[in-house]
From Swiss-Prot:
GO MF annotation, one: ATP binding
Guanylate kinase-like domain mapped to chain residues: 3-181
Lineage: Bacteria, Pseudomonadati, Pseudomonadota, Gammaproteobacteria, Chromatiales
Keywords associated with the record: ATP-binding, Cytoplasm, Kinase, Nucleotide-binding, Transferase
Pfam (any one): Guanylate_kin
KW Transferase (keyword) present: yes
Native source species: Nitrosococcus oceani (strain ATCC 19707 / BCRC 17464 / JCM 30415 / NCIMB 11848 / C-107)
Subcellular location, record wording: Cytoplasm
Protein family per UniProt: Belongs to the guanylate kinase family.
Enzyme Commission code: 2.7.4.8
Function: Essential for recycling GMP and indirectly, cGMP.
Binding residue positions for ATP: 10-17
UniProt name for this protein: Guanylate kinase
């Protein structure tokens, strides 16, 4: 039985990472794919837990060998989702979450037309700016650049299947769970899981 592929994207400051981690921790048979990146680890990040931290040479070898479902360059660093991190899980019937941007969604959807894409929105522009300012002692120019990048990401919201507003964390988390559960209840997926029951009922 094949699992479902979920893509979750959001502007920086929308709370995407916390939401997808909570989703993966609260539901059975769903995993969060861990991306490869060439950027150095930030304080508190662990290799193999937050990202697979690799050199440019390793990344290029993987890319050249067709090892990525999607890859992109962001602020001078490279990010990619390895096929080996996703395909075996799907084949086992596990659902997989990809935490990527709109560009990555386009690449993945070209290969998996039936994947489910979700975009996380902040509740307001003011809240988004406030969250971005909380990330560090940045200059006004840096905050303005981050806001510009966030708005550019948001402009692609209409390429996604679902929109979830992260104002109240628990409400947004419940919304994400509902999307996953609705996918699991689709007839085509349930037919496989309930094959013996259906056979018995239709004898």
């Amino acid at each position: 039985m094949s699992g479902s592929l979920f893509i979750v994207a959001a502007p920086s400051g929308a709370g995407k990472t916390s939401l997808v981690k909570a989703l993966a921790a609260s539901m059975a048979d769903i995993r969060l794919s861990i991306s490869h990146t060439t950027r150095p680890p930030r304080p508190g990040e662990q290799d193999g837990m937050d990202y697979h931290f690799v050199t440019e040479a390793i990344f290029e070898t993987m890319e050249g060998g067709g090892g990525f479902l999607e890859h992109a360059q962001v602020f001078g660093h490279r990010y990619g989702t390895a096929k080996e991190s996703v395909l075996p899980l799907l084949a086992q019937g596990m659902d997989v979450i990809l935490e990527i941007d709109w560009q990555g969604r386009r690449q993945v959807q070209a290969q998996f037309p039936h994947c489910v894409s979700i975009f996380i929105l902040p509740p307001s522009r003011e809240t988004l700016e406030h969250r971005l300012r909380l990330r560090g002692q940045d200059t006004e120019a840096v905050v303005a650049r981050r806001m510009g990048d966030a708005c550019a990401e948001i402009s692609h919201y209409n390429e996604f299947d679902y929109l979830v507003v992260n104002d109240d964390f628990e409400v947004a988390h419940t919304d994400l769970r509902a999307i996953v559960q609705s996918r699991r209840l689709l007839r085509l997926r349930q037919e496989k899981r309930l094959k013996s029951l259906l056979g018995e009922l239709l004898e």
